UniProtKB/Swiss-Prot annotation:
The protein's role, per its UniProt record: Involved in coproporphyrin-dependent heme b biosynthesis. Catalyzes the insertion of ferrous iron into coproporphyrin III to form Fe-coproporphyrin III.
Catalysis performed (reactions): Fe-coproporphyrin III + 2 H(+) = coproporphyrin III + Fe(2+)
Protein name in the entry: Coproporphyrin III ferrochelatase
Name of a matching Pfam family: Ferrochelatase
GO molecular function: ferrochelatase activity; metal ion binding
Species this chain originates from: Nocardia farcinica (strain IFM 10152)
EC class name: lyase
Major localization listed first in the record, in broad terms: cytoplasm
PROSITE patterns registered for this protein in UniProt: FERROCHELATASE
Any one annotated GO CC term: cytoplasm
Assigned keywords, A-Z: Cytoplasm, Heme biosynthesis, Iron, Lyase, Metal-binding, Porphyrin biosynthesis
Recorded name of the encoding gene: cpfC
Listed NCBIfam families: hemH (TIGR00109), PRK00035.2-1 (NF000689)
Amino acid sequence: MAVEALLLLSFGGPERPEDVMPFLENVTRGRGVPRARLEEVAQHYLHFGGVSPINALNRDIIAGVERELDEAGIDLPVYFGNRNWHPMVEDTVAEMARDGVTGALVFPTSAWGGYSGCRQYHEDIERARAAVGPAAPHLTKLRQYFDHPLLIEAFADAIRAALERLPADRRDRARLVFTAHSVPVAADAAAGPPADGGELYSRQVADAARLCAAATGFADHDLVWQSRSGPPQVPWLEPDIVDHLEDLAGRGVDAVVVCPVGFVSDHLEVIWDLDNEAKDKAAELGMAFARASTPGTDPRFPRLVVELMREHLDGLAPRRLGAEPGYGCTIDGMPCASGCCAPQRRPAAAGR
């Protein structure tokens, strides 16, 4: 397949107050989510002026990738498309076809396996190509990158910087806590090729957390979850970050560094669930709290994207640190394997 462009594919988010409810309706379409619940989530966006930071952050990543490509002498345009808000991926793939692109690589803003972390991006690709028709370019999704050295290095430096923001007299006893987006237990059980035993998502997150902790010299750490949604009777990955802070306080912990290892950028789930809810809970408990930044704004992140591209462009050897397998690289929306990351009946995800 000829590679003539890169498509950055993401979740999407509102960029003005009047976008909030239509965006949430797109996210939850067909799931029977009550209007009252949508209005509740909308308040999270309106707290920040009705603007999700995710689109601006993705445009910054694209600018960084364009600089890296230019420095490497790689002459390829970079396109931007979203699943749930403008620019919609269907419109972007149509634009690529009009521009004469016949083949492109796709970088998803999720490093993980699982339905929402990987297979749903394959579905986005398949849907967009079907909407465009025979003129649609062939699209190759790049592999999962949860254990790429540049990602781990960026997180490790962010953890060190967060530790320095804690009061000096508490740093030596600070607890390192990693967070990632919770998913239903059944969805995690179905994550990965069936022959791989399931739970690929939580295994990869645990692997990345282990690598980051080792890189920063922490002998021990915790992995917890955040941003769950849906009916309380549906089991999701636990414990929740807020509940875990209460547990730590009960054990005498008075300082934490929280690293959102499951997130590429400081989008709404990070700045609401961690910088508001978790931070407020820590203050209530008398606990010093510092949140590590996400890697999307780190200059190493666009270098990571270009390295993944070069694995296809010039045969660059993949760089990996983890023990868990990684998948995700297929063409035109094909799943990684039969039955891989089979979709569950899902409640609405939290906002971005």
